[in-house]
């Protein structure tokens, strides 16, 4: 397991995806053999999300090392707030990927994190994640919390206060764990954060809460949106994009982040969700968006299912299938 996703390289699309497939699939196959009964199940296009998360490590870790660790003695931390088991299985064909947490740690091996904290509410998946990380990177300092993020975020944030720069990943399943009480303390921490934002789901929640607020369950949806977004301006949102903008604005205003960039991840079944990066490094955020978005929108990015079939030997070879655009 010695292949890493490197950021900012001017690779052709086929080279980029060959490297990414090797990295995520080969490491996923290796990690799956540890606690094989416990994996997370997603669609093929979750690979694009994992690429987005790992790619930012290529910007973040060397800069944090040179500008803060070496000069001022900072610790460099990685926090995965909804970490899962560390292995993803695709629903369509059962291919394995390494998850966001091992993917980020492997991508940072040249400038490794001093501190790694992962949160996984399912104790069996959390235990599998810990064993996988210990096997994969035995020298890495890793803490896994088997709790809801709302119960541990304050404690994690306190741990990150003293001379620590962090990269925080907030990658929920739809709404799970998406409360300001849970994610707000971490978004306030010094460093960068990446949030998976399910725009369509939040828009449906908003529409339901506005249309029938006399029902208790729908009232609860409205209260949840108010808690997450900071006020009831969501009621006036005229589109899903406007609702997303309200969330982004709150993070920028309340959490000492000065820039953001977002990448649209297409879903296999149609629709999309966003990967939103919050940072102070506006130029680097634009570079991240440019590089990753170009790959996702290429013919290769649009045909992840075919690439996985090639990788698994279910169709012709990768070099025969891929043509440079």
Label each region the model flagged.
Residues 190-204:
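Conserved beta-strand signature within the Rossmann-like core of class I S-adenosyl-L-methionine
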Residues 48-155:
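SAM cofactor-binding core of SAM-dependent methyltransferases
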Residues 175-186:
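A short, conserved alpha-helix within the catalytic core of class I
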Residues 152-162, 184:
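Short amphipathic alpha-helix with an adjacent loop that forms part of the alpha/beta core around
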